[in-house]
Amino acid sequence: MVIASLESTHAISTSIVLSSDLWTEFYGTESVSSASPNYVKLTLPSYNKWHHQALISHCDNDDSLPFGSAGLPTNFIKQSQVRPMFSSIEIEPYVQQLPNLDNLVLSLNPDLFNELNQLSKEEQRKFLTLRFNLLFGITVLNVNQVVYPAFCKVTSSSNDFGILTDQTQIVLVPDSNVVEQSRSNDEFTEFDHLFSLHVKIQSLLDPVPVEFLSPPQPDTTDNDLFAFVQPNILLQLGVPSGTFVRVIAEEQEMLVQLFVLFAPNEYECDSLYVSPRVRYVFMNHARVIIQRPNLALNRFSVSNAVTLSRIGCQINAQRRYQDIISHHLALYFSEKQRIVKVGDLIPITFDSNYASMFTDDIRSGQHDTLVWFKVEEIESDSNEEYHIIDSSITRLSTVKITSRELMPKSICDYDRFYNLSPLFHYDEDAFPFAKRLKDILNTAIKCSARNVNVGTSIMLHSSSPNVGKTMLTRSVCAELGFHLIHVDCLSLTSNSNTSDATNKTIGYIRAKIETIISYVEKVVIFLSHLETILEDEQNQQDNTSSKMARQMNVEMADLIEEYTTKYKGTVFVGSTNDIDNIPAIVRSRIKFEIDVPVPTEKQRLQMFRWYFDPYVLNSQTPKLRSLISHNVPLQTVSVQSAGLTPMDIRSIVKAVKYKCYQRLKQNDLLIDMTDITAVINIARDRFSDSIGAPKIPNVTWDDIGGMDVVKGEIMDTIDMPLKHPELFSSGMKKRSGILFYGPPGTGKTLLAKAIASNFSLNFFSVKGPELLNMYIGESEANVRRVFQKARDAKPCVIFFDELDSVAPKRGNQGDSGGVMDRIVSQLLAELDGMSSGGDGVFVIGATNRPDLLDEALLRPGRFDKMLYLGISDTDKKQANIIKALTRKFTLESGIDILDIAKKCPFNYTGADFYALCSDALLNAMTRVAGEVDEKWEKYNMENKKNISLRYWFDNVANENDLKVVVKLQDFELAQQNLIPSVSEDELRHYLRLKSSFESQ
């Protein structure tokens, strides 16, 4: 890769040109006369440090270009007469095989589209070649590339880039945006210089690199005051780049140093882009006035003393953070010559993990916390408004905590600018529960502004842990500008049920709140894991424990009531993994309850897209960049991760990143689908028992033989709702319950797994004993949890094996408490929910004794599709089963599977045939092992050697000696020792059961 000087060719083309020295370095001297096209990869400079624009382009040689330079057409960099461009570009030869474009969509000027639409396809192609210089077989086009300003742009194609060929299907579409995007607001010839100018104000996403500053600035310049505009604003104000200007909005005013933005960039022409320090001052204003001042840098005087106050927040109010904050505050003013005035805001970032052990010798790592200070007073010998802080002269002191509204992240993404730990953004369309939380908090803000205190309190609850309740609260609070007081109740648990323990717990919570609540206006008091300190007094085993539990519950209820009514703009939010364990007295104080479910497929897709964004992926490791390959289908990844929580997804992304460290390429770690699939499989295997994560089994229809009729019935029941859900949108109930019954060993479990594999459904197997629990009510709760996990992992199959042990006829059981009857009743209720609101969840049961099942299970809407899986009654069906079981065997040539089937009785089940084939393979292996021993002994005798068997395998044996070939005699030997698992009498019994159920 070469850093080349960037030159503009002042032409419009789809090819670039290289200077002779670069051409020779890339392609040699012989390539000048070569007729084959050459291509390069360009990486354009970008103000977005996480997203660099890379283009593949055809290139030619230009002897007139200066040494070490590359000439780019104006349509590549959107250059105009008044817009300066970057001075350099990264360039390298592209030596890989370029893909051909199968299809291409071009957006055209509407007038041009109307003209071309009257031409034939061949005439359209000729026009594109003549007018836009698109050479078929040579030109490379990239998605979003401007082919000709104001007339033509690439909208989409079969690949991100590729060669335009004669076989490329070109689709032309009209698009007025092509014209609008080409218009440049900065192309002026004559205008009057303005003293002030109204513009929009926006926050920079990332700090601008020092090499992008024009003119260059000393290292000690206050970079927080850097502001950036397009050149048209500088021209209208009549000031050069690097000039100090005033930014004014109503009573707010600030001094900034104005710099020009180089092309190419995606910034707006009528906006001022500033750092979070400046944006915080003007956070309530969308537009500001830029005014030319009569001010020079050398007129700033050095202040003698500056007094700062702390902006109230939970971190700034805690003593344990003061040493590390003071250290970074001193660094902030010593590293740069900061220019301040009274009322300015000062941002300080630090690593909170080092707070408890911080010393001046420790250099903290990755910053994760931001606090703010306000300039209260400046002592100086001059009367100037703005002063420089010189760390060797100016005396700094901090005083009180002051109140100020927090800047919402919707206005300024300060986490990204300061490279703090990123917070997931909840899209309201994909996450309805996040939208509801935002709506409630916004309503609380509006009521507070009108002096109406509604005492808002919210409970976030879920049926599974680690679904992101804390992440949701932090994200929404940051987006809306709420201060957050977070207390994790897991750290407050106490083993002693005493009044003193209750007082300490409540006192600790109140102390956390009281230190800051007086200094903030919009605040959320967030208590997570409430169920760890709150207990229902009725569930206690003695009066003392019941009394202590009631005392804690009353104190917590009073705390919620007090802070939400006494302090305006205060919202209480609690979280729990089991809403039923929250005592009634506390729950009565909660006005809103929001269920936070396990992410759906759409929500998981949003999370994977966010986690694999270059900024999020590399924010903690900026020196070693990771990128996700373009061919990774995140939609498929979201399907494979069904049932996983946000914490699991975050762990998967981290593991994927570490897994691909070994494939280092150009300082970028390229993540591909193989890495992601491997990590997801490992995560599922590791956590399946603890989190109950369902899997997609690996059983195909080829593994099953002799069930063609049953397969057709299954396709009608399951395939139809999945492929055509619109047919059931009118209110028609789908059939989601299937019952397999028949003799044991006929493939009921295997068939259920094949269903899940064939339709890419997650598979959730439930055994009867694991539902039973000694505590009253827990067995029914286990049934509810099973169906809830299936809904979280949909599309999903719940498979109840040996259903007769789970749901026997009610009233016939002798168990105390009637637990089996209650399990059946709960199962019936859940099955009724499947037919109405359980889209994507299918229930399959398997039993050998359908006559023992509760009759209510077999009614319509539940297990209403009963399929008998019997024993194969023809030689052909038996041969199909043997063929499926032996498809991975090496059979002797000439062996006929039908001949094997003819020797088998008609009471062999599928399990019996499995035993037959397994024993035949074992017989073959035993036979081959004996033959190998004979060959080894014979070799030693003939050669008068005493070599080991291992040496014989490694050096003497050939491929045929190692191959296990199953012969007919192996099957005959296996059949002699095989006893059918179902007798003739039992088979007749199952046939009578079949006829009785089919006649109902």
Curated annotation (Swiss-Prot):
The keyword DNA repair does not apply. Transmembrane segments: none annotated. It is found in: Cytoplasm, Cytosol; Peroxisome membrane. Its EC number is 3.6.4.-. It catalyses: ATP + H2O = ADP + phosphate + H(+). Pfam families: AAA (PF00004), PEX6_4th (PF23315). Coiled coil: none annotated. ATP binds at residues 742-749. GO terms for molecular function: ATP binding; ATP hydrolysis activity. It is a peripheral membrane protein. PROSITE patterns: AAA. GO terms for biological process: protein import into peroxisome matrix. Keywords: ATP-binding, Cytoplasm, Hydrolase, Membrane, Nucleotide-binding, Peroxisome, Peroxisome biogenesis. One of its GO terms (cellular component) is peroxisomal membrane. Its main location: cytoplasm. Interacts with PEX1; forming the PEX1-PEX6 AAA ATPase complex, which is composed of a heterohexamer formed by a trimer of PEX1-PEX6 dimers. Belongs to the AAA ATPase family. Component of the PEX1-PEX6 AAA ATPase complex, a protein dislocase complex that mediates the ATP-dependent extraction of the PEX5 receptor from peroxisomal membranes, an essential step for PEX5 recycling. Specifically recognizes PEX5 monoubiquitinated at 'Cys-6', and pulls it out of the peroxisome lumen through the PEX2-PEX10-PEX12 retrotranslocation channel. Extraction by the PEX1-PEX6 AAA ATPase complex is accompanied by unfolding of the TPR repeats and release of bound cargo from PEX5. PANTHER family: AAA-FAMILY ATPASE, PEROXISOMAL ATPASE PEX6. This is Peroxisomal ATPase PEX6.
